[in-house]
A protein has these predicted regions:
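Transmembrane alpha-helices and immediately adjacent membrane-cytoplasm interface residues
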Residues: 45-109
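Juxtamembrane boundary at the C-terminal end of a transmembrane helix
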Residues: 1, 279-296
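Final/C-terminal transmembrane alpha-helix of multipass membrane proteins
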Residues: 264-286
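Polar-ligand-bearing catalytic/cofactor-coordination segments
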Residues: 14, 18-31, 80, 84, ...
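Basic, amphipathic juxtamembrane/active-site segments
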Residues: 179-188
């Protein structure tokens, strides 16, 4: 059962990284939603499989031999259980380090009242910091901030500057910080999973594309003006995510806005199929938990 559950998890994690470009172009926000669901399911299935294998190995140590009623749940044996236990320790340790770093980084990135120019814009604060470097990012929380540099604001036209601010607002509305953290967890704590890096990269690109579409709107002339502006800035400064990604984003803003509800049947079918198989495997395994309870 552990092998089947692990296979479901590996497939669910890898799926968003398999030919993601069509959905990144046509339906970036829906790509993010489906990718987060698939990755979350995959990570859960992988951890469940590793814990199940570790538990069977622990039972072997406790009783000093084979445990026939549950051995079929983890056929990989003692060495497999030991490897699973090591993987669990790795995942927990890396996740704890990542959570600590994310919390420290969030606190450090918030701009104090004495630095820069602070302007209130609805329920958030726009902060202009005194630097010529190209800087634009958000700080979520009870008092969200959009931080932008004086140099970037001076170089952008009014339309492009508004797009940048709306782009950052879209990140706040979409709670994209948590999705970005999920991508980081995937490529650090689950680094041993094939395709994890590709999926994490696709998810990050999807977050940027989704915010672009939310901010750009449907007016084609405005979209093309924005595309020219961010393309020029990306080539000049290589900011945020590299020149290639800036060019990819600007090329997709030249075209008309994608439909609000595209055809997602194939992607949804894949996520549903893997979810169903994983749930069935877990339910089948749960029917054999009585030996664990008998040892309590």
């Amino acid at each position: 059962m552990t092998l089947l559950l692990l296979a479901c998890g590996l497939l669910a994690v890898a799926m968003p990284g398999i030919r993601p470009k069509p959905m990144l172009v046509a339906a970036p926000r829906w790509f993010v939603r489906l990718a987060v669901a698939s990755v979350g399911l995959g990570m859960f299935a992988i951890v469940a499989a590793l814990l199940l294998s570790t538990s069977v190995g622990a039972l072997h140590l406790m009783v000093g031999g084979a445990v026939t009623p549950v051995d079929h749940l983890a056929p990989e044996g003692v060495f497999g259980s030991a490897a699973a236990a090591a993987a669990v320790v790795w995942i927990v340790g890396r996740s704890a380090v990542l959570a600590s770093r994310a919390a420290r980084g969030h606190r450090a990135a918030r701009v104090d009242a004495w630095l820069g120019k602070h302007e209130t814009a609805g329920d958030l604060e726009v902060v202009i910091i005194p630097t010529d470097a190209s800087v634009a990012y958000t700080i979520p929380g009870r008092q969200p901030q959009i931080v932008i540099s004086e140099g970037l604001r001076a170089r952008l036209s009014a339309d492009v500057l508004r797009f940048v601010l709306d782009h950052e607002r879209a990140h706040l509305r979409g709670r994209d910080r948590w999705n970005a953290l999920l991508a980081t967890a995937l490529e650090t704590a689950f680094v041993f999973v094939p395709g994890a890096a590709r999926t994490a990269a696709a998810l990050r690109i999807g977050l940027e594309r989704a915010a672009d579409e939310d901010a750009a709107g449907g007016l084609l002339t405005r979209r093309r003006t924005i595309a020219r502006g961010i393309s020029a800035e990306g080539v000049r400064a290589h900011i945020a995510c590299g020149a290639e990604l800036w060019q990819f984003r600007s090329r997709n803003l030249v075209d008309p806005a994608p439909p609000a509800l595209p055809d997602l049947s194939l992607a949804a079918l894949g996520v549903t199929a893997v979810s169903t198989v994983g749930v069935l495997v877990a339910l089948h395994a749960s029917a054999d938990f009585s030996p664990y309870l008998a040892l309590l």
